Amino acid sequence: MELYTALLAVTILCLTSTMGVSGDCSTNISPKQGLDKAKYFSGKWYVTHFLDKDPQVTDQYCSSFTPRESDGTVKEALYHYNANKKTSFYNIGEGKLESSGLQYTAKYKTVDKKKAVLKEADEKNSYTLTVLEADDSSALVHICLREGSKDLGDLYTVLTHQKDAEPSAKVKSAVTQAGLQLSQFVGTKDLGCQYDDQFTSL
C-alpha cells in the first residue's frame, strides 16, 4: 500500500509519495458555512504548519500549491519538497466542489516540472479537502486520505500566502475551535524549504 505525504495539501498532499497516516477519518468534519470561496481560490498557498494525526515516517516535507475553481471543478498545481532527501516532486489535481460548501474530493496526476504527465491518476486513491477557515492571508484545512473505500486518516494543514508567515488570529482561533493546538503542529519554517513558484503559477 502506498503511503501518503503529510503535505498537500494542501493541501495538501500527494497520493504517490512517502509520508503516511492510517486509521479512520473524523466523521464530524464539515466546511465552514458562509465562507467566500474567493478567499481560498485566490493566489498561491504555502503549507506553514501540518498535523499528521497518526504519523508512520519521519521525513519532513514542504509544500506549496495553487487551487483554482471554475463551474464547480477544482484544479490544483502542487509542488512538494522532501527536506530530508532534498528532492522535489510535482502533481496536477482535479476534483468537484461539493454543494455543501468549500469541500472537494480530488485525484492527482504525477507530472514533471514542465507539467508533462509521468503517471496518470490512480482511480482508487483520492482525498477529500475541507476548508475550516480562510481569510485574505491564511487558511486551515482538513484532509481525509483514502485508498479505495478505506480511510487512511486525518491531516490538518495551516496555509499562508507568504512563505514562513504566521497564520492570522482568525485561523489560530479556528485551530483551537477544532480541538487542536498550534503547538502540536510541525512548522516548516526551519526545514530549509525550497519552492518552485513557476510551476505553481496556474
Curated annotation (Swiss-Prot):
<feature type="disulfide bond">
    <location>
        <begin position="25"/>
        <end position="144"/>
    </location>
</feature>
<dbReference type="InterPro" id="IPR012674">
    <property type="entry name" value="Calycin"/>
</dbReference>
<dbReference type="GO" id="GO:0051381">
    <property type="term" value="F:histamine binding"/>
</dbReference>
<keyword id="KW-1201">Platelet aggregation inhibiting toxin</keyword>
<dbReference type="GO" id="GO:0005576">
    <property type="term" value="C:extracellular region"/>
</dbReference>
<dbReference type="GO" id="GO:0046872">
    <property type="term" value="F:metal ion binding"/>
</dbReference>
<keyword id="KW-0732">Signal</keyword>
<protein>
    <recommendedName>
        <fullName>Nitrophorin-2</fullName>
    </recommendedName>
</protein>
<keyword id="KW-0800">Toxin</keyword>
<keyword id="KW-0964">Secreted</keyword>
<comment type="subunit">
    <text>Interacts with human and rat coagulation factor IX (F9) (inactive and activated) in the presence of Ca(2+).</text>
</comment>
<keyword id="KW-0408">Iron</keyword>
<keyword id="KW-0349">Heme</keyword>
<dbReference type="GO" id="GO:0042311">
    <property type="term" value="P:vasodilation"/>
</dbReference>
<dbReference type="GO" id="GO:0070026">
    <property type="term" value="F:nitric oxide binding"/>
</dbReference>
<keyword id="KW-0838">Vasoactive</keyword>
<keyword id="KW-0479">Metal-binding</keyword>
<dbReference type="GO" id="GO:0090729">
    <property type="term" value="F:toxin activity"/>
</dbReference>
<keyword id="KW-0840">Vasodilator</keyword>
<comment type="similarity">
    <text>Belongs to the calycin superfamily. Nitrophorin family.</text>
</comment>
<keyword id="KW-1199">Hemostasis impairing toxin</keyword>
<feature type="signal peptide">
    <location>
        <begin position="1"/>
        <end position="23"/>
    </location>
</feature>
<dbReference type="InterPro" id="IPR002351">
    <property type="entry name" value="Nitrophorin_domain"/>
</dbReference>
<dbReference type="InterPro" id="IPR023613">
    <property type="entry name" value="Nitrophorin"/>
</dbReference>
<keyword id="KW-1015">Disulfide bond</keyword>
<keyword id="KW-1203">Blood coagulation cascade inhibiting toxin</keyword>
<dbReference type="Pfam" id="PF02087">
    <property type="entry name" value="Nitrophorin"/>
</dbReference>
<feature type="binding site" description="proximal binding residue">
    <location>
        <position position="80"/>
    </location>
    <ligand>
        <name>heme</name>
    </ligand>
</feature>
<comment type="function">
    <text>Heme-based protein that deliver nitric oxide gas (NO) to the victim while feeding, resulting in vasodilation and inhibition of platelet aggregation. Reversibly binds nitric oxide (NO). Also binds tightly to histamine, which is released by the host to induce wound healing. Exhibits anticoagulant activity. Inhibits interaction of activated host coagulation factor IXa (F9) with phospholipids. Inhibits factor IXa (F9)-catalyzed activation of factor X (F10) in the presence of calcium and phospholipids irrespective of the presence or absence of factor VIIIa (F8).</text>
</comment>
<feature type="disulfide bond">
    <location>
        <begin position="62"/>
        <end position="193"/>
    </location>
</feature>
